[in-house]
Curated annotation (Swiss-Prot):
<feature type="compositionally biased region" description="Low complexity">
    <location>
        <begin position="112"/>
        <end position="127"/>
    </location>
</feature>
<comment type="function">
    <text>Involved in auxin transport. Regulator of the auxin signaling pathway.</text>
</comment>
<dbReference type="GO" id="GO:0009734">
    <property type="term" value="P:auxin-activated signaling pathway"/>
</dbReference>
<feature type="compositionally biased region" description="Polar residues">
    <location>
        <begin position="129"/>
        <end position="139"/>
    </location>
</feature>
<dbReference type="InterPro" id="IPR039621">
    <property type="entry name" value="BG1-like"/>
</dbReference>
<dbReference type="GO" id="GO:0060918">
    <property type="term" value="P:auxin transport"/>
</dbReference>
<feature type="region of interest" description="Disordered">
    <location>
        <begin position="1"/>
        <end position="146"/>
    </location>
</feature>
<dbReference type="GO" id="GO:0010929">
    <property type="term" value="P:positive regulation of auxin mediated signaling pathway"/>
</dbReference>
<feature type="compositionally biased region" description="Low complexity">
    <location>
        <begin position="88"/>
        <end position="104"/>
    </location>
</feature>
<feature type="compositionally biased region" description="Basic and acidic residues">
    <location>
        <begin position="75"/>
        <end position="87"/>
    </location>
</feature>
<keyword id="KW-0472">Membrane</keyword>
<feature type="compositionally biased region" description="Low complexity">
    <location>
        <begin position="208"/>
        <end position="223"/>
    </location>
</feature>
<comment type="similarity">
    <text>Belongs to the BIG GRAIN 1 (BG1) plant protein family.</text>
</comment>
<dbReference type="GO" id="GO:0005886">
    <property type="term" value="C:plasma membrane"/>
</dbReference>
<keyword id="KW-1003">Cell membrane</keyword>
<feature type="region of interest" description="Disordered">
    <location>
        <begin position="208"/>
        <end position="233"/>
    </location>
</feature>
<protein>
    <recommendedName>
        <fullName>Protein BIG GRAIN 1-like A</fullName>
    </recommendedName>
</protein>
Length: 357
């Protein structure tokens, strides 16, 4: 058996092998003697692989300081933006040469807290602050202020032009402005205590029919509102009034209409009377239908009597004026229509004219 003394592969790990270890290695190699020795190409490949790995490690060591410098530059840019924003928001005129003590401490703290590079790249250059960005921002700020003032002046001009635009003229508005101008002139001239304003009310012509349709006109109500300065402010208000005119009735505006309470009371009374008239008409129709039912059942047993009542007219079959006291409307006996008609609107119209006149 031929014994060959070879240098073990793990020479880097075992610098000084012992005699027992070398003996054991030779025994193991003799046992595996059937396998051929490793070729030279495999050894070259291993060496080439080790060289590539060492080169990649060296490149990583060179690239890591570059990444670290980039992170430091990003932190520096972020801190610079924060300081610029704080300076512009507070509008302070402090000098722009270098960092303050708190800013430099925070900057060094961030650089220390970042990933530690190898010993060769721990010494880092100090950042240099330039004022070029500050000058550009200082130039842009007055431009923005000038644009804001320009837009504000344009908005004020447009608002003043809108105020000068004339409102559409209406007769009611012209009358209201005229009355208000009279009252303001009276307030400015204290010597003239007595001023009388007359409001003309145009009467509508009488219609040729029995009852004209409802005509509406405007009634000016002058109200005084006390103010804190002691002077009285007057305002004009127009209220619609519905009036029913007859042929024989002439409309005159009483003085009581100037009082709003009296007008409300008259309106309430008129509504109440109208409601009572409608209720009476309903009761009258109800009694008529009941009577008609009774007469139809007994019509075969009752003989006609032409001389029954000489005072009755053609419509006495519909309305018997003698029996109106039973339903409580005896007072409306004279106003009820008894001339060949059963229309309720005519009856209500005649009753309403009787109440108003």
């Amino acid at each position: 058996m031929e014994i060959t003394w070879e240098k073990p592969k793990s020479s880097s790990h075992h610098r000084n092998p012992s005699f027992s270890s070398t003996l054991l290695d030779q025994i193991y190699r003799s046992i595996d003697d059937s396998s051929p020795p490793p070729p030279l190409e495999s050894i070259k490949k291993k060496k080439h692989h080790h060289q590539q790995r060492n080169a990649s490690l060296h490149e990583d060591r060179e690239i890591s300081p570059i990444y670290h410098r980039r992170s430091i530059a990003a932190d520096f840019e972020r801190s610079r933006r924060k300081t610029d924003f704080l300076r512009h928001s507070n509008s302070s005129s402090s000098d722009s040469s270098g960092f303050s003590s708190s800013e430099s401490d925070s900057f060094h703290g961030r650089s220390k807290s970042s990933a530690s590079p190898p010993s060769s790249s721990r010494q880092q250059p100090k950042p240099i602050r330039t004022s070029s960005v500050d000058h550009s921002s200082a130039v842009q700020k007055p431009k923005e202020l000038g644009g804001f003032l320009r837009t504000k002046s344009k908005a004020l001009k447009i608002y003043s032009d809108l105020k000068k635009v004339k409102q559409p003229i209406s007769p009611g508005g012209r009358l209201a402005t005229f009355l208000n101008s009279l009252f303001t002139n009276a307030a400015t001239n204290p010597k003239k205590h007595k001023k009388t304003t007359t409001v003309a009310v145009v009467e509508e012509p009488h219609s040729s029919s029995t009852c004209s349709s409802a005509s509406s006109f405007s009634r000016s109500c002058l109200s005084k509102t006390p103010s804190s300065s002691g002077k009285s402010k007057r305002s004009v208000r127009f209220c619609p009034v519905n009036v029913i005119l007859d042929e024989d009735s002439s409309f005159t505006m009483p003085y009581a209409y100037n009082n709003e309470r009296l007008y409300d009371n008259n309106e309430a009374k008129r509504v109440e009377e109208h409601r009572r008239v409608i209720q009476a008409a309903k009761d009258l129709l109800r009694t008529y239908h009941n009577k008609n039912k009774v007469t139809t059942t007994n019509i075969n047993n009752v003989e006609e009597d032409d001389e029954d009542d000489a005072a009755s007219c053609a419509s006495s079959d519909l309305f018997e004026l003698e029996n109106l006291s039973a339903i409580g409307i005896e007072r409306y006996r004279e106003e009820l229509p008894v001339y060949e008609t059963t229309r309720l609107d005519n009856m209500n119209r005649v009753i309403a004219t009787g109440l108003i006149v």
